Amino acid sequence: MEFLSEKFALKSPPSKNSDFYMGTGGALEHVMETLDNESFYGKATAGKCVQAFGPLPRAEHHVRLDRTSPCQDSSVNYGITKVEGQPLHTELNRAMDNCNNLRMSPVKGMPEKSELDELGDKCDSNVSSSKKRRHRTTFTSLQLEELEKVFQKTHYPDVYVREQLALRTELTEARVQVWFQNRRAKWRKRERYGQIQQAKSHFAATYDISVLPRTDSYPQIQNNLWAGNASGGSVVTSCMLPRDASSCMTPYSHSPRTDSSYTGFSNHQNQFSHVPLNNFFTDSLLTGATNGHAFETKPEFERRSSSIAVLRMKAKEHTANISWAM
């Protein structure tokens, strides 16, 4: 009893053979004593019920309480009635289970979560079905041939040409238009790639720079060096002198040497008329070693030797003409 009065301060109507009745502001034993051996239905018991719930200042409230008091209404139940043969804790647990069931039960009229998910899936399916699907068209060889013929004539056919082509190829005008768009993109890509390759080939042909030097120049360089060492002993080429380094930077600047040799040759034609050709070649090599660049390439040497031979023949003819005139 003490446990119930302290922990569970509940209200219940006074009923016969009821062991549990608790009111506000009083202990359970006091309430039970005031309700013993009394009939709980009538005006006489109204005062005791009011005393259990609290005193009222005026008498007319007793009449009103007689009509609306929970003591007179047996249908209202604010507490837990003990059933014979069952302990109290089972009743309390049952009441708590009922409250939990009421809280967890869904509200009527509201769709459940599974139904909402189904509605969402249906909406997604409707949206996806409303989207335009893309289908890949497989063209036959005859269709491609007809399309390529028109593409060779014009890259941008008008609507009339596309409709006529669609009738011949048994395609729709939209398919023909899409094919021409893709074909133009492919053609532009090929043209761009061809221009890049052409530019690369032109650059390679214009600026063809070989990394390794030519091998045919090595024997001529060695021969010129040996000839210079054998003739003078202390002859130093112009490339080794610091004051004449400009001649090393221009390997083909032989104009002063050639002009002086040609001038000396024309002035002294009679003097060189009896000199053998081999001695003249040796002198020209020595002159080139002292005045200009000693490293001669093979084509330059051949050109000079042929021009010297022609001048030698002209000198002989001139000498013969002079002697014949005398």
Swiss-Prot record:
Disruption phenotype: Mice lacking Alx1 die within 24 hours of birth. The overt phenotype is acrania and degeneration of unprotected brain tissues. This is most probably the cause of the death since no other abnormality in limbs and visceral tissues is observed. The defect in cranial bone formation may be a consequence of extensive loss of forebrain head mesenchyme due to cell death and neural tube closure defects earlier during development. The penetrance of the acrania/meroanencephaly phenotype is variable between mice strains. Heterozygous mice appear normal and fertile. It is found in: Nucleus. The keyword Lyase does not apply. Residues 192-326 are annotated as: Transactivation domain. Acetylated at Lys-131 by EP300; increases interaction with EP300 and stimulates ALX1 transcriptional activity. The modification N6-acetyllysine is found at residue 131. The modification Phosphoserine is found at residues 12, 69, 306. GO terms for biological process: anterior/posterior pattern specification; embryonic limb morphogenesis; embryonic skeletal system morphogenesis; mesenchymal cell development; negative regulation of transcription by RNA polymerase II; neural tube closure; positive regulation of DNA-templated transcription; positive regulation of epithelial to mesenchymal transition. GO terms for molecular function: DNA-binding transcription activator activity, RNA polymerase II-specific; DNA-binding transcription factor activity; RNA polymerase II transcription regulatory region sequence-specific DNA binding; sequence-specific DNA binding. A motif (OAR) lies at residues 306-319. Residues 132-191 bind DNA. Signal peptide: none annotated. SMART domains: HOX. Keywords: Acetylation, Activator, Developmental protein, DNA-binding, Homeobox, Nucleus, Phosphoprotein, Repressor, Transcription, Transcription regulation. InterPro entries: HD, Homeobox_CS, Homeodomain-like_sf, OAR_dom, Paired_Homeobox_TFs. GO terms for cellular component: Golgi apparatus; nuclear body; nucleus; transcription regulator complex. The OAR motif may negatively regulate DNA-binding and therefore transcriptional activity. It is found in the C-terminal transactivation domain that stimulates transcription. Binds DNA as a homodimer; required for transcriptional activation. Interacts (via homeobox domain) with EP300; acetylates ALX1 and stimulates its transcriptional activity. This is ALX homeobox protein 1. It comes from Mus musculus.
